């Protein structure tokens, strides 16, 4: 998202063009080193081949406040945090870090639709896990209960309103996805030289 009064861009491609014109000069806020919003910004810079000036904050709330105030022009942030600011027009959503357009942000394209950013995804995910030696029949029962819960229209709608899209993968699919994500993020962190203080 961006503060439209501070950064005159209409698309992710515009951000990339501006960043290439002035490497390291455009500020981007994040909610602290290693935070998902920070890592999304890192992955974006790597994928787009640009350098932004990262401004760390102690959490999303103060970062969003400074983007609203125009102190920093943009940041990656979750939908639940940005929803009211986007709805009011104070902030502009340029793209979503999911592979497809999100129902809660109609008309906002996925960043992956930007030329040269196919496959870009930095969407936070959550999952339900159990101890490694949990019997398969218990895992099956847990999954059955979970699927029933997220299939309930009221529960599903509440999750979507909070910016979470409930998925119903199998335990193996989720395990494969977690491994793929862990490798992607480990590579991004290593390339960026990120270390916690």
Question: For the regions a protein language model found, what residue spans apply to each?
Answer:
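Phosphate-coordinating loops and pocket residues in cytosolic domains that bind phosphorylated ligands
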Residues: 17, 69, 113, 122, ...
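Hinge/capping helix and adjacent helix->loop/strand transition within the periplasmic-binding protein
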Residues: 1-62, 111-113, 125-158
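C-terminal lobe and pocket-closing loops
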Residues: 82-151, 183
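Alpha-to-beta junction loops
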Residues: 22-26, 50, 68-77, 90-93, ...
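Short helix-initiation/N-cap motifs at beta->coil->alpha
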Residues: 32-33, 55-65, 69, 78-81, ...
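Generic preference for hydrophobic
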Residues: 28, 54, 76, 93-94, ...
């Amino acid at each position: 998202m961006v503060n439209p009064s501070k950064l005159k861009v209409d698309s992710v491609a515009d951000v990339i063009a501006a960043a290439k014109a002035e490497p390291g000069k455009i500020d981007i806020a994040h909610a602290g080193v290693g935070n998902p919003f920070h890592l999304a910004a890192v992955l974006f810079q790597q994928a787009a081949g640009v350098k932004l000036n990262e401004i760390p904050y102690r959490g999303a709330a103060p970062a969003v406040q400074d983007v609203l105030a125009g102190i920093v022009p943009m940041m990656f942030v979750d939908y639940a945090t940005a929803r009211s600011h986007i709805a009011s027009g104070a902030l502009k959503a340029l793209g979503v870090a999911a592979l497809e357009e999100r129902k809660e942000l109609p008309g906002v394209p996925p960043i992956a639709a930007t030329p040269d950013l196919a496959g870009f995804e930095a969407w936070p995910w959550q999952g339900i896990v159990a101890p490694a030696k949990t019997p398969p029949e218990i895992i099956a029962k847990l999954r059955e209960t979970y699927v029933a819960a997220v299939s309930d229209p009221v529960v599903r709608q509440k999750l979507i309103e909070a910016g979470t899209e409930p998925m119903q993968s199998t335990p193996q699919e989720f395990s494969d996805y977690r491994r793929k994500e862990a490798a992607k993020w480990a590579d991004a962190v290593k390339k960026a030289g990120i270390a916690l203080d």
